[in-house]
Swiss-Prot record:
HAMAP family: HMG_CoA_synth_arch
EC number of the protein: 2.3.3.10
GO molecular function: acetyl-CoA C-acetyltransferase activity; hydroxymethylglutaryl-CoA synthase activity
Reactions listed under catalytic activity: acetoacetyl-CoA + acetyl-CoA + H2O = (3S)-3-hydroxy-3-methylglutaryl-CoA + CoA + H(+)
Role played: Catalyzes the condensation of acetyl-CoA with acetoacetyl-CoA to form 3-hydroxy-3-methylglutaryl-CoA (HMG-CoA). Functions in the mevalonate (MVA) pathway leading to isopentenyl diphosphate (IPP), a key precursor for the biosynthesis of isoprenoid compounds that are building blocks of archaeal membrane lipids.
Organism the protein comes from: Pyrococcus horikoshii (strain ATCC 700860 / DSM 12428 / JCM 9974 / NBRC 100139 / OT-3)
Lineage of source species: Archaea, Methanobacteriati, Methanobacteriota, Thermococci, Thermococcales
Sorted UniProt keywords: Acyltransferase, Isoprene biosynthesis, Transferase
Protein's name according to its UniProt entry: Hydroxymethylglutaryl-CoA synthase
Length: 350
């Protein structure tokens, strides 16, 4: 048996949707407060006082439903990936399912795997639909990422998410999956213990042993298993903790940056963690043409990567205009100062 993950039935994306909060804080503003002058990105998205990973997931799910044009009651599974769930004990997926009118006849669960929790949910949704157990399944990745005040994570930890409704490949799918591959090891590059408020990072483990090793290995293995080369892809979306890492990974794989830039959003909204590649793919689907092939590689600390190859179909031409596009949310912005940011992110502890 080969390494490629490919279900017996062909499945695809029936609908997709993204959401990015309106507020932004510039890296210069964070640097002003902490006396730092080297910035990894321009600005990041900040959730409002009434927003969290669940509300972001709901907005993304509603947009996916608009594009799918299906009855939410036909969705038999909603799986939500996040590392910033509002409840330690209580599923976020049930709240989302209720909000979009999908209850009660469905599976629901929350997934965790750092920044690739959303694509873990996607792998499960692909298998669930392909098995014949469901007509449609929804996978969501959303986060309101946190960074310790003054830590370099504070400059990049953003907020946003995306949802994908999976169904059997048909004239209604906007793109179909050619195959996928997952690669995991026990690599301690990033963690947060129970009762700790902010995550810690393993510094020297972050780059080569973690991100680059897993992303490049997953991408290369997927291409080898499918008999494809970098030249066969029109776009590539990699996990984007910053702007630099995805471009370096692309260079290591022989992929020109022009294929990466359309889905590279972290410079403008930050690292949305579980939502990062899913929002990036949504942005690419907003502009892609039928027949375009997209390489999609997530990464989650701890560590692992999921790699997918998807091919865009004719239905994208109509469906992409049925809900707000990623660029619409990025342009809908209001810049705030550090004081309001700290209040919105509840960094003041009394």
């Amino acid at each position: 048996m080969g390494k490629l993950l490919k279900p017996i039935k062909d499945v695809g994306i029936v609908g997709y949707g993204a959401y990015v909060p309106m507020y932004r804080i510039r890296n210069e503003e964070i640097g002003r407060v902490w006396g730092i002058s080297n910035f990894p990105i321009e600005e990041k998205a900040v959730p409002g006082l009434d927003e969290d990973a669940i509300t972001i997931g709901i907005e993304a799910a509603r947009n996916a439903l608009k594009r799918a044009k299906i009855d939410p009651k036909d969705i038999r599974a909603i799986w939500f990936g996040s590392e910033s769930k509002p409840y330690a004990v209580k599923p976020s997926s049930t709240v989302i399912a209720e909000a979009i009118g999908a209850t009660p006849d469905l599976e629901a669960a929350d997934f965790e795997f750092a920044c690739k929790a959303g694509t873990e949910a996607l792998q499960a949704a692909i298998g669930f639909v392909a098995s014949g157990m469901a007509k449609y399944a929804m996978a969501i990745g959303a986060d309101t990422a946190q960074g310790r005040p003054g830590d370099h994570l504070e400059f990049t930890a953003g907020a946003g998410g995306a949802a994908f409704i999976i169904g059997e490949k048909s004239s209604e799918t906007v793109a179909y999956f050619e195959g996928s591959y997952s690669y995991v090891t026990d690599t301690p590059d990033f963690w947060r213990r129970q009762h700790e408020h902010y995550p810690r990072h393993g510094n020297r483990f972050t780059g080569e042993p973690a991100y680059f090793h897993h992303v490049v290995t997953a991408a290369k293995t997927l291409m080898d298993e499918l008999g494809l080369t970098p030249e066969d892809f029109d776009y590539a979306v990699f996990h984007q903790p910053n702007v630099k890492f995805p471009l370096v990974a692309a260079r290591m794989l022989g992929i020109p940056k022009e294929k990466v830039l359309p889905g590279l959003l972290s410079g403008r909204i930050g690292n949305t963690y579980s939502g990062a590649t899913m929002v990036g793919i949504s942005a690419v689907l907003d502009i892609a043409k039928p027949g375009d092939r997209i390489l999609w590689v997530s990464f989650g600390s701890g560590a692992g990567s999921d790699a997918f190859s998807i091919v865009v179909q004719d239905a994208i031409e109509e469906k992409r205009n049925l809900a707000p596009k990623v660029e619409d949310y990025i342009k809908r912005r209001k810049v705030i100062d550090y004081a309001l940011y700290a209040k919105a992110r509840r960094k003041y502890i009394i």
